[in-house]
Amino acid sequence: MDEREALIKAGEIARQVKKEVVDLIKPGAKLYDIAEFVERRIVELGGKPAFPCNLSINEIAAHYTPYKGDGTVLKEGDYLKLDIGVHVDGYIADTAVTFRVGMEEDELMEAAREALENAIATVRAGVMIRDVARAIEETIRGKGFNPIVNLSGHKVERYKLHAGVSVPNVYREADTYVLQEGDVFAIEPFATTGAGQVIEVPPALIFMYLRDRPVRMLQARRLLMHIKKNYKTLPFAYRWLQDFLPEGQLKLALAQLEKAGAIYAYPILREVRGGMVAQFEHTVIVEKEGAYITT
């Protein structure tokens, strides 16, 4: 399977899981059950999770994934952002959709969805990133909402979810990267009723391996080896490690590894004013005359 075939296969799996999960999104549903279903189906369909299933509600914009024992349930009217990642041999599909639990799509969701459509319509080889960002910003502001300025889409490479080039939600003169044929990008507009900025809040429930570092605690060394072997350079969930070590030891080991610079912790991201947040996302392959949507 070549790179393009793997990217397309990952996208097909992500699309299928998005379809299947709809039936679970209802008042009273547990986030834990939804995340476990999503990740299990990814594997059953022939892929692997490229990152933990993100389930972020209302003013939480990103990086919430449930843990074992998490009792969080969906309530009618919640804005649920479902962000899923699939990889096939390291080639990634990253896609997100917002649900209004028990209700129809509203104007906030429409703004984010249309921003994604308009952004993708600008994508082709030779276009600057800032022109894609402009389409996102103009669409969201035109609908009376704010784009989130400190969240962005990103270039994707094999086993690298964030490959060094961002696709912001707002136009910036300095974003002069020119899209190349064959580039893979995840484009993800975030629209909010709030101020248009996110802040980090504890706890971190998602982590990523950075590098080997000496640590004193034996369990921390064992944990780092386990992380490297199983997740390579892709993000992983606290939940995925809860059976590996007892709770107290796991928290201590993760804290040591983070302090040593061996792993990176992704804090939960919340809209600064508590505004509602909607997000839609596709992964695209840049082509001469447009974009091939894999998801």
Swiss-Prot record:
EC number, UniProt record: 3.4.11.18
PROSITE patterns the record matches: MAP_2
Organism: Thermococcus kodakarensis (strain ATCC BAA-918 / JCM 12380 / KOD1)
Cofactor mode of binding and number, as noted: Binds 2 divalent metal cations per subunit. Has a high-affinity and a low affinity metal-binding site. The true nature of the physiological cofactor is under debate. The enzyme is active with cobalt, zinc, manganese or divalent iron ions. Most likely, methionine aminopeptidases function as mononuclear Fe(2+)-metalloproteases under physiological conditions, and the catalytically relevant metal-binding site has been assigned to the histidine-containing high-affinity site.
Keyword ATP-binding among record annotations: no
Protein name per Swiss-Prot or TrEMBL: Methionine aminopeptidase
Lineage: Archaea, Methanobacteriati, Methanobacteriota, Thermococci, Thermococcales
Gene3D superfamilies with a match to the protein in the record: Creatinase/methionine aminopeptidase superfamily (3.90.230.10), Winged helix-like DNA-binding domain superfamily/Winged helix DNA-binding domain (1.10.10.10)
Gene Ontology cellular-component annotations: cytoplasm
Annotated residues for binding of a divalent metal cation 1: 83, 94, 281
Keywords: Aminopeptidase, Hydrolase, Metal-binding, Protease
InterPro entries assigned: Creatinase/aminopeptidase-like, Met_Aminopeptidase_Type2, MetAP_archaeal, Pept_M24, Pept_M24_MAP, Pept_M24A_MAP2, Pept_M24A_MAP2_BS, WH-like_DNA-bd_sf
